[in-house]
Structure formats: C-alpha cells, structure tokens
Regions:
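Peripheral, non-catalytic segments flanking oxidoreductase cores
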Residues: 1-173
Length: 173
C-alpha cells in the first residue's frame, strides 16, 4: 500500500472485508433515490451549503478551469456527530430522504464501513513511513469525510460541450 501511494498517489483495495451485499444494498438505495422526480430530489438540496450534506442537482458543480458544469448529480453522506460535539457548528447533520426505504441504514452503513477501512489504511501508511501505528488517529477521528454517490445521466446529444466530471483534484489535500 505504501509503495502504491508513493508511486501513484492512490491505490485500489480488494479483499477489504466490506460485504458485497452491503455495497449492493447501498447502490440500490442510491439508484432508487436518483430515479425520483427532480422536484422530489430538490427537497433535499441545501442551497448555500456547498453541497456538504444531502442532494446536489445537475448544473451546480463545475470543475476547476472548466467553462461548463459537470453532467452529474450527487448525494453527500458524512459523519454523524454526538449532539454536544465541538464540530457540530462546522459539520452539518446528514439529511435522509423519506421516499427511499433503507436509505439511511444502507447509505450510512456503507459510509461507516468505508470510514473504518480508511482508518485501517492510515494505520498501514503510518507503519510504512516509520510512525506509530495510531499516529493519524487523533488527527482524523472526527474528520469531515463524505461518501458521495454520483449519478451520471445518459448523454443524449453529440454536440454538448460538458463532460460528466471534469479533471479535478481532491480539494481537501
């Protein structure tokens, strides 16, 4: 894992232990949400929040240096904080659609599984660079990570200038 990050800056992880049934259940609820009518989905769009939680419709996000918005809509799921958390004022609570049964359970379940996997990766990377295994733990334990299921619509015209998602970098790094 350390070599992959040194050479490429990322890696693909197989054998991670997240059950395929859990991944499939999350994909199912995400697909059912994106299939809802636009006016229903827009109930979950939080204007002025930068899409930190809930739904972001088509035409909102534009990649850096692009003239046209990306052809995608997405949903953000983030960490659920204890009520008295000192981070509550900077990390919005999650929003859960009422129209899709199981969305919260499957969506947040996958978020938690991926968050735990991320912690395992950080422990491995810490050891790779000769740090204590738990070096990153107190630096990320309340991090504002997100799970972002994205829906890319079918492209129905050949002359559109947009791309589904323009070239980009992780904005928080």
């Amino acid at each position: 894992i350390g070599a992959a990050y040194r050479e490429f800056g990322f890696c693909c992880i197989s054998g991670h232990g997240i059950p395929k049934a859990d991944i499939d259940a999350a994909y199912d609820v995400f697909q059912r949400f994106f299939a809802l009518p636009a006016e229903t989905k827009m109930q979950y769009h939080q204007v002025g929040t930068g899409g930190a939680r809930g739904y972001t419709p088509f035409g909102i996000e534009t990649a850096k240096d692009s003239k046209y918005p990306d052809l995608k809509e997405f949903w953000h799921i983030g960490r659920e904080l204890p009520p008295a958390s000192k981070y509550a004022e900077v990390m919005a609570p999650n929003i859960w659609p009422r129209e899709v049964e199981g969305f919260r359970q499957s969506g947040y379940g996958l978020y938690q599984a991926l968050d735990s996997l991320g912690a395992r990766v950080l422990r491995a990377l810490a050891l790779h660079i000769d740090l204590a295994e738990n070096f990153f733990e107190d630096k990320v334990n309340f991090g504002n990570s997100i799970l972002r299921p994205i829906h890319y619509p079918p492209i129905t015209a050949v002359d559109i200038p947009n791309v589904r998602a323009g070239a980009h970098e992780d904005i928080n790094f």
